[in-house]
């Protein structure tokens, strides 16, 4: 594992990404802890922490400029409190393929008032009953969850399910948090799927080349790594078209 030092930050790749944001690439260093980001001098719109060994999402200084945080393919099982104080303008958070287990572990995301684009795909918590409705209720500012637009019908269903004393009790009952944090403990892993055919790989690469947002690029890369093909992956939310979120012209999900 590699300690995230000021020297590493200075040496890491820095570039203007596909959506013209200034990005810091800290991908694949096997970093275990987020620290020393004050060395960035708040000069980046996006930071890529993909493919590291991070277990807890915290340790950020005040980064007013940061809008996009990619933390897929880590080992995150906890989300720190008070992220809104450090990341007031965060709009996109990609937590795909981590180790979040309990619905209550997602509660700290509610404080991120600018968060509109969130992915928690391939975390054990997504298998919990009422997962999607719980996140929609607890983090109502999110407009796109797991790469699916939040529908007005879903918001109404979430409000109905969790409102009032009975709803509050239901939310409390299903939202327990992980009680222990053991750095050496084993974490859930997904079974490996068969790889895609060469034609499928080429289709995904073409889709990546035509992607219009950084989050979409990361989703397609994740599909390529897991052997899934765009349009064939299992949907984690409702499959009906439903009525889309009202006030669509106010949505700012990075596209």
Curated annotation (Swiss-Prot):
Native organism: Homo sapiens
Pfam families in UniProt: LRR_9
Gene Ontology molecular-function annotations: RNA binding; U2 snRNA binding
Protein name, as recorded: U2 small nuclear ribonucleoprotein A'
Record-linked PROSITE patterns: LRR
GO cellular component, as recorded: catalytic step 2 spliceosome; nuclear body; nuclear speck; nucleoplasm; nucleus; small nuclear ribonucleoprotein complex; spliceosomal complex; U2 snRNP
Position of the Glycyl lysine isopeptide (Lys-Gly) (interchain with G-Cter in SUMO2) cross-link: 172, 221
LRRCT domain boundaries: 123-161
GO biological process: mRNA splicing, via spliceosome; RNA splicing; spermatogenesis; U2-type prespliceosome assembly
Gene: SNRPA1
């Amino acid at each position: 594992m590699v300690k995230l030092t000021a020297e590493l930050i200075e040496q890491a790749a820095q570039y203007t990404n596909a959506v013209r944001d200034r990005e810091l690439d800290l991908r694949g260093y096997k970093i275990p802890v987020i620290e020393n980001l004050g060395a960035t001098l708040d000069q980046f719109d996006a930071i890529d922490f993909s493919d590291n060994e991070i277990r807890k999402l915290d340790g950020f200084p005040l980064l007013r400029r940061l809008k996009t945080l990619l933390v897929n393919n880590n080992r995150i099982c906890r989300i720190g409190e008070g992220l809104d104080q450090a990341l007031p303008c965060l709009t996109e958070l990609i937590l795909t393929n981590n180790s979040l287990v309990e619905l209550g572990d997602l509660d700290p995301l509610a404080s991120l008032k600018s968060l509109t684009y969130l992915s928690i795909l391939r975390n054990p918590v997504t298998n919990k009953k009422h997962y999607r409705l719980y996140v929609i209720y607890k983090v109502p500012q999110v407009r796109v969850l797991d790469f699916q637009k939040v529908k007005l019908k879903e918001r109404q269903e979430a409000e109905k399910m969790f409102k009032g004393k009975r709803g509050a009790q239901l939310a409390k009952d299903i939202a327990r948090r992980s009680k222990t944090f053991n750095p050496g403990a084993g974490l859930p892993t997904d079974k490996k799927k068969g790889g895609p055919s060469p034609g499928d790989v080429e289709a995904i690469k073409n889709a990546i080349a035509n992607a219009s947002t950084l989050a979409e690029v990361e989703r397609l890369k994740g599909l390529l790594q897991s052997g899934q093909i765009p349009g064939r992956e299992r949907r984690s939310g409702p499959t009906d078209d439903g009525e889309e979120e009202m006030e669509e012209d106010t949505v700012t999900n990075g596209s």
